[in-house]
């Protein structure tokens, strides 16, 4: 009896030692719940059982949180996907560890495309090529939608590189 107990305990210890939880390098493809909206192009999802991943919407660059139109972009993204399930198609991991992904809401709408249509994001052609995104940005500019109502809006990339004094001017 004692020998059986030792064998069982040894087997249990070996199994416990061999068990390592799955660790993802980036969010896996699938449908997941949005648990936080950071800004107009970044949000956090929950992957069961309890993994969280920061997702960067592929192909767009939305105004920064403190930049003009930044809060509008964040609120609009919240309305599109906040607290809902989104389908993500991971493309790559960026230098900040976020999963850059194509994202679709529960209605099947392309989230990046919706942000561009609303005039609340730039088409980020440097990292993603999609003629639909380019065309929708052209149409949003022509309609002066969202940030395009300004004669020369500052891109998020230019805003990030600007000195603090310049940033204060555009908040």
Q: Each PLM stretch: what is its role?
A:
Residues 2-171:
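Small beta-barrel nucleic-acid-binding modules, primarily SNase/OB-fold domains
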């Amino acid at each position: 009896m004692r020998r059986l107990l030792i064998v069982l305990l040894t087997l249990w210890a070996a199994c416990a030692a061999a068990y390592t939880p799955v660790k993802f390098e980036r969010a896996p493809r699938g449908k997941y719940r949005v648990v936080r909206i950071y800004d107009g192009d970044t949000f956090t999802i929950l992957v069961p059982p309890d993994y969280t991943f920061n997702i960067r919407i592929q192909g767009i660059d939305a105004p920064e949180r403190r930049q003009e139109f930044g809060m509008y972009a964040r609120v609009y993204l919240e309305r599109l996907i906040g607290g809902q399930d989104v389908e993500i198609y991971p493309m790559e991991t960026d230098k900040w560890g976020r999963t850059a992904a194509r994202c679709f809401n529960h209605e099947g709408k392309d989230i990046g495309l919706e942000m561009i249509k609303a005039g609340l994001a730039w088409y980020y052609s440097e990292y993603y090529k999609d003629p639909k995104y380019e065309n929708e940005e052209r149409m949003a500019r022509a309609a002066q939608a969202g940030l395009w109502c300004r004669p020369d809006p500052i891109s998020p990339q230019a805003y990030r590189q600007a000195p603090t004094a310049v940033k204060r001017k555009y908040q």
